[in-house]
């Protein structure tokens, strides 16, 4: 291809604009996470994630529609291009191979796409993406989604049989309400903080749990740090216990228990 038509130039300009929008959305999310104290609200993060998802979907659709054109175009610098001052930009434009990290992302994306295509074809049933142990047992007796993508009664029954067990198993592997997941704790809190670039020091969940245990007061227990004679003083003024049968009689008849 020697010259580009106005339509081709328009396609390239649309690609550039969509990539700029995605870059700005990602930059906005990173900035809000790094600079906000406390962290942004869940609704704010969800809104930003939706914007990024829409940008990715727009880019994916645009690249798919113009796949042939974009593959046939080669980037070559014009004689007037400032190669000395924009050497890094020129190097990126003339790359023939993807960056190793990008190549890994593309490879994982293609594998996920192939798995989704195989699952939708009905060759392995609707539960082909479930864990191997559960999927093997379910696919043996499940035919898959019927025409129009609607689940049959057998599919629904198998889904309801699998979902509670799997959800419970996943919940047990999480640390709900903590600052760090169990996986992050196993890897090391300091390593996770360094990877995420956290600037605020978050309390370790174990320390907060120990503090809660020290403050728990059970039947006959005391708050940690309370004087030893507190229990004896309370015992002197404690009223006598009421038998359970008199408590039940009061609940059913309204007759006050006998004074002892």
From Swiss-Prot:
GO terms for cellular component: core mediator complex; mediator complex. The keyword Transcription regulation applies. It is found in: Nucleus. GO terms for molecular function: RNA polymerase II cis-regulatory region sequence-specific DNA binding; transcription coregulator activity. GO terms for biological process: regulation of transcription by RNA polymerase II. Keywords: Activator, Nucleus, Transcription, Transcription regulation. Its main location: nucleus. The keyword Repressor does not apply. InterPro entries: Mediatior_Med8_fun/met. PANTHER family: MEDIATOR OF RNA POLYMERASE II TRANSCRIPTION SUBUNIT 8 (PTHR13074:SF9). Component of the Mediator complex, a coactivator involved in the regulated transcription of nearly all RNA polymerase II-dependent genes. Mediator functions as a bridge to convey information from gene-specific regulatory proteins to the basal RNA polymerase II transcription machinery. Mediator is recruited to promoters by direct interactions with regulatory proteins and serves as a scaffold for the assembly of a functional preinitiation complex with RNA polymerase II and the general transcription factors. Belongs to the Mediator complex subunit 8 family. Component of the Mediator complex. This is Mediator of RNA polymerase II transcription subunit 8.
């Amino acid at each position: 291809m020697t010259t580009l038509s106005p339509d081709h130039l328009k396609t390239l300009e649309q690609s550039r604009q969509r990539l700029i929008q995605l870059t700005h959305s990602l930059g906005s999310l990173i900035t809000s996470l790094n600079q906000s104290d406390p962290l942004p609200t869940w609704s704010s993060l969800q809104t930003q994630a939706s914007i990024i998802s829409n940008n990715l979907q727009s880019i994916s659709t645009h690249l798919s529609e113009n796949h042939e054109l974009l593959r046939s175009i080669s980037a070559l610098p014009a004689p007037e291009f400032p190669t000395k001052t924009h050497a890094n930009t020129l190097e990126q434009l003339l790359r023939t191979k993807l960056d190793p990290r990008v190549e890994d992302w593309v490879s994982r994306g293609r594998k996920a796409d192939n798995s989704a295509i195989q699952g939708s074809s009905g060759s392995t049933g609707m539960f082909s993406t479930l864990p191997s142990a559960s999927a093997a047992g379910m696919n043996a007796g499940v035919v898959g989604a019927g025409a129009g993508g609607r689940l049959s009664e057998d599919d629904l029954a198998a889904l309801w049989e699998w979902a509670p067990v799997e959800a419970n198993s996943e919940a047990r592997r999480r640390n709900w309400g903590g600052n760090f997941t169990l996986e992050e704790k196993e890897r090391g809190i300091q390593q996770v903080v360094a990877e995420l670039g956290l600037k605020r020091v978050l309390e370790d969940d174990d320390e907060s749990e120990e503090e809660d245990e020290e403050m728990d007061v059970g039947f006959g227990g005391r708050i940690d740090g309370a004087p030893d004679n507190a229990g004896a003083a309370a015992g002197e003024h404690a009223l006598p216990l009421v038998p359970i049968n008199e408590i039940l009689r009061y609940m059913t008849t309204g007759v006050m228990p006998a004074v002892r």
